Amino acid sequence: MNAVQQPDIAWNRDHLDPGAEQEAVIRGITGEIAGKGFVVANLDRLVNWARTGSLWPMTFGLACCAVEMIHAYMPRWDLDRFGIIPRNSPRQSDVMIVAGTLTNKMAPALRKVYDQMPEPRWVISMGSCANGGGYYHYSYSVVRGCDRIVPVDIYVPGCPPTAEALVYGITQLQKKIRRTGTIFRE
């Protein structure tokens, strides 16, 4: 006798139908794990849940809002506890935080950094200057909102917004990532 033996299978019409075989396997697995406390989830939700716990932002501080963004990383608010660790390279980050006044000269650089980020990527606009031009809205050299250059997911209002507002905006982004069922954003 060989070390490996073929199982004794009685061939019938069910083996010709792949759907019946799949159903039999699913019934067997369901019967095996019933009542044993297994967690069943789809891959998309699992991936999105994992992403929310490890957001790596690219900080794009342009003006006074950047100071409040830095405060969010200090011990009082400590964004590291949320798994949010700032990265120095856009190729390693998945979130961009635009904080401050975006000028016409800086807009191409913002777009270039955004384009270097891997998919999926998200943008948080922090402060009234980044949201809509703010105090400098009518200046000839100011872009009236960074959403004219890059798609924005979360707007954090204020002039300047507090670190607490940024933390709240990040938690809203985490909820949005969990809620959306897409791995790649169109």
From Swiss-Prot:
Keywords: 4Fe-4S, Cell inner membrane, Cell membrane, Iron, Iron-sulfur, Membrane, Metal-binding, NAD, Quinone, Translocase, Transport, Ubiquinone. InterPro entries: NADH_UbQ_OxRdtase-like_20kDa, NADH_UQ_OxRdtase_20Kd_su. The keyword Chaperone does not apply. One of its GO terms (molecular function) is NADH dehydrogenase (ubiquinone) activity. Disulfide bonds: none annotated. Its EC number is 7.1.1.-. Its main location: membrane. NDH-1 is composed of 14 different subunits. Subunits NuoB, C, D, E, F, and G constitute the peripheral sector of the complex. This is NADH-quinone oxidoreductase subunit B 1. It comes from Acidiphilium cryptum (strain JF-5).
